[in-house]
Design a protein with these regions (language model features):
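S-adenosyl-L-methionine
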Residues: 96-155
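Glycine-rich SAM-binding Motif I of class I
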Residues: 59-64
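Conserved beta-strand signature within the Rossmann-like core of class I S-adenosyl-L-methionine
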Residues: 161-164, 190-198
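Rossmann-like AdoMet
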Residues: 1-50, 65-104, 110-112
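Short SAM/SAH-binding signature in class I
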Residues: 141-143, 157-166
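Class I S-adenosyl-L-methionine
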Residues: 200-232
């Protein structure tokens, strides 16, 4: 399949997301496989934020998909802390161009993300925080500009779930290296989860070492299987 050049990250010669149905891929791999709605509902009832960690912010596709997903759930008073990392941040204009293929489906969510992203000085390394306020509640976006291991080690709170969404292990092995996945395990709550599109044996071994019990789920977007893990 021909991949549009605008979807390719030149740093890794790899696409930012699946070109078949990237929004559905995010919903299935990261949201449904992690029982997000049920777990976010528990957070609403206990008045505690649901904490997400992500490796590989890219064009913000997963954030856009998340906004659509929770909006359709009908939940209100949602509080999400979304912690992500990007070593090579895009300009807001490039982000908008990459996401433009979804404009007819999630235009409102794309506009909300890009407007929020414009408030971040992507030329400065370290943490940047901004708030996305929607009818369903609030997403506190915390974006680390820099290296993923530094981001994970600097987190003050452990996460309820991790979306492992970096470029493929063959294209960007550093974001799948054992010491990073071990640190992610250490910054995951007991009973917390992670999920990813890759079933590479090295990644599976590192996640098991990091304390996750792995489950294999049916894939989507051309992937036969995907992984989900539970921290014990």
């Amino acid at each position: 399949m021909l991949i549009p050049s605008k979807l390719v990250n030149e740093q890794f010669d790899d696409r930012y997301f699946d070109v078949v149905d990237a929004l559905n891929e995010a919903r299935q791999i990261y949201f449904r496989n992690n029982n997000l709605i049920e777990r976010i509902t528990t957070g609403i009832e206990s008045k505690t934020p649901f904490i997400i960690g992500e490796t590989g912010f890219g064009a913000g596709r997963v954030v856009v998909a998340l906004m659509e997903f929770v909006k359709k759930s009908g939940l209100r008073n949602i509080s999400i802390e979304y912690n992500s990392v990007e070593l090579y941040p895009l300009s807001p204009e490039r982000m908008l161009d990459i996401l433009s293929g979804f404009k007819d489906r999630v235009g409102e969510e794309i506009d909300a993300l890009v407007e929020t992203y414009r408030s971040i000085d992507i030329t400065v390394a370290g943490w940047h925080s901004a708030k996305i306020q929607k009818s369903f509640g609030t997403i506190d976006l915390n974006l680390w500009i820099g290296e993923a291991l530094e981001m994970v080690e600097s987190l003050e709170k452990s996460c309820d779930v991790w979306f492992l969404d970096g470029h493929s292990p063959k294209k960007n092995p550093s974001i799948w290296r054992p010491e990073l996945l071990m640190a992610i395990g250490e910054k995951t709550k007991q009973g917390g989860t992670c999920s990813t599109f890759t079933v590479a044996s090295d990644v599976k071994s590192a996640l098991i070492e990091a304390g996750f019990i792995l489950n294999k789920y049916p894939g989507c977007g051309g992937k036969k299987h995907v992984l989900q893990g539970v921290k014990y």
